[in-house]
Amino acid sequence: MRLILLGPPGAGKGTQAQRLVHHYGIIQLSTGDMLRAAVAAGTPVGLKAKDIMASGGLVPDDVVIGIISDRLEQADAKDGFILDGFPRTVPQAEALDILLQSKNLALDAVIELRVDESALLQRVENRVAETTARGEQVRADDNPEVLSQRLASYRALTEPLIRYYSERGRLLTVDGMMAIDDVTRDIRRVLRRSGVPMSKFGVRRW
């Protein structure tokens, strides 16, 4: 089972990714973690990334793809994975498809957690009001203005990506505004219905 999970800030991607990992016996591949591991290990692409970051530059897509390629060769990735933080753009999605094809692999599904942005913002505003009323310090990430900017950025980047995967028949959409357990159940339901192959280890309870 090879998956991508898409969703805006506040949609609960982290929670659902961990539940997928546990339930299906696959691994979560975070581009940030893979990048740091490659740099620490001193791999060729890791050293290239290190030089770029040391000069203050952004790591280009081809280097990230190289790091993902190396990671997919490791034994624990053979039975499936969920990609976290990549792709974010259509060119990255195209590069990922080419990489997977070169390894005789393919994505099984791209799960989009669809949310009501105004409801997300209202949740944050309510949380800020409740925290302030208790005389407690508001968390740095509980900032409606910052969240609004992040949502706009996500929407601009991701809408073309969602179209890309929808046109290729890989997109599965789940209502991310439901309770956490209901979202989890719906993800499993759409995966079963779409015929996505399960991990060879089967499924587990959470």
From Swiss-Prot:
SUPFAM superfamilies: P-loop containing nucleoside triphosphate hydrolases. PROSITE patterns: ADENYLATE_KINASE. Pathway: Purine metabolism; AMP biosynthesis via salvage pathway; AMP from ADP: step 1/1. The keyword Cytoplasm applies. ATP binds at residues 10-15, 127, 178. Residues 30-59 are annotated as: NMP. Gene3D superfamilies: P-loop containing nucleotide triphosphate hydrolases (3.40.50.300). It catalyses: AMP + ATP = 2 ADP. Keywords: ATP-binding, Cytoplasm, Kinase, Nucleotide biosynthesis, Nucleotide-binding, Transferase. AMP binds at residues 31, 36, 57-59, 85-88, 92, 139, 150. Residues 126-142 are annotated as: LID. GO terms for molecular function: adenylate kinase activity; ATP binding. It is found in: Cytoplasm. GO terms for biological process: AMP salvage. InterPro entries: Adenyl_kin_sub, Adenylat/UMP-CMP_kin, Adenylat_kinase_CS, P-loop_NTPase. One of its GO terms (cellular component) is cytoplasm. Its EC number is 2.7.4.3. Pfam families: ADK. It is an enzyme of class 2 (transferase). Belongs to the adenylate kinase family. Monomer. Consists of three domains, a large central CORE domain and two small peripheral domains, NMPbind and LID, which undergo movements during catalysis. The LID domain closes over the site of phosphoryl transfer upon ATP binding. Assembling and dissambling the active center during each catalytic cycle provides an effective means to prevent ATP hydrolysis. Catalyzes the reversible transfer of the terminal phosphate group between ATP and AMP. Plays an important role in cellular energy homeostasis and in adenine nucleotide metabolism. This is Adenylate kinase. It comes from Nitrobacter winogradskyi (strain ATCC 25391 / DSM 10237 / CIP 104748 / NCIMB 11846 / Nb-255).
